[in-house]
């Protein structure tokens, strides 16, 4: 088919070849089957499997962490001892080259274990939905597998391949009972930021467990347990609490949602527990949650939120902070700090930027904001010399050099470098779309999506600090 030069001044266009990507993938699969240009041999269960590193890296975060950089260039044979089974790995390798995943009730658990090991979250979700659809309509109680799948590397390297987001799963597909001893939690350098992290990670976990109690009845779930003793005390400095999703918890998820009651989940007075679980506790252990908290209650005290005995156990050091907020029970050392904190509840923002009109509830926030206009960047990275307006931005930047990703998703295990990124990611699982377009009624998961929509569809002038306003039509 020949092509002729377009006449001068003619409008150009972009033609999309819809079959091109599938043809390229098919050609790569043919090269793999014929052993052409394959540059790595994978030993899975003693069985050698030839593949291309580029394809493995593009599909799996695990292989990306192995082959990235110069160190991966010299890896010609990769053995996975104690890793996924061959019958679970082979379908995944075919999927990488064909985009078709073959599942059956007999192979789904092995494929699920292998996908978890290889950090292929979208495949994990597909396997989970398949298992749930296969067994729940029949009313069959699926016996959990005895052995958990091998754990993949916990810290993903910076810049790992983008994972498929797909459509958000319903919340019921991401609930599970924690089983067995909790795995050791990795050190969290930002665990001191407990208030923010509690509402993102712990609220998600306990609300899921609480929904199981509300929806089900019958004998207690044998797999469900929460850490006790020293494990519970360490929960305030750990970001995971041993809830890494595995094969066992995901299989129990598919079968216990409507048949088991996860009662007696906690027996330790120092532990935060969901309100839904308090009905199964003795009267002496029940407590009312502090105002503003729908998920957690203190098991240590019997009074309302003002009980100081329980709060001192959970938050040592409050004796040096005599000023307490009556709404959320936060404690402060100075009266001025309490007055400033109250603006969080009232929504008052008395401090205004004289340049752009942005308003803030604290003078320190206004001072930090003013550096945007002045160009001042007082915080410098000692590694690369980059400078930042806020010290929080510097701390987040340093993680790029260390490769740390301290914030794990409690549902799928994906780890993130920044807390705000985790918050946005969690909405994929919950289906939450909090950003609303008033003119057309559409909802969006991320603020950037709403701003782009307003600019493209309504001609809005968007600014993160000033309320959006719709401009006149063209």
Curated annotation (Swiss-Prot):
Subcellular localization, as worded in the UniProt entry: Nucleus
ZnF (C2H2-type) intervals: 323-345, 351-373, 379-401, 407-429, 435-458
SUPFAM superfamilies: beta-beta-alpha zinc fingers, POZ domain
Domain BTB: 38-105
Molecular-function GO terms, alphabetical: DNA binding; DNA-binding transcription repressor activity, RNA polymerase II-specific; RNA polymerase II transcription regulatory region sequence-specific DNA binding; zinc ion binding
Swiss-Prot/TrEMBL induction comment: Induced in activated lymphocytes.
Biased composition annotated in UniProt, kind: Pro residues: 150-160
InterPro entries membership: BTB/POZ_dom, SKP1/BTB/POZ_sf, Znf_C2H2_sf, Znf_C2H2_type, ZnFinger_BTB_dom_contain
Assembly and binders: Associates with BCL6 through the BTB domain.
Free-text note on domains in this protein's UniProt record: Amino acids 178-210 are essential for repression activity.
PANTHER family: AGAP004733-PA, ZINC FINGER PROTEIN 37-LIKE
Name of this protein: B-cell CLL/lymphoma 6 member B protein
Lineage: Eukaryota, Metazoa, Chordata, Craniata, Vertebrata
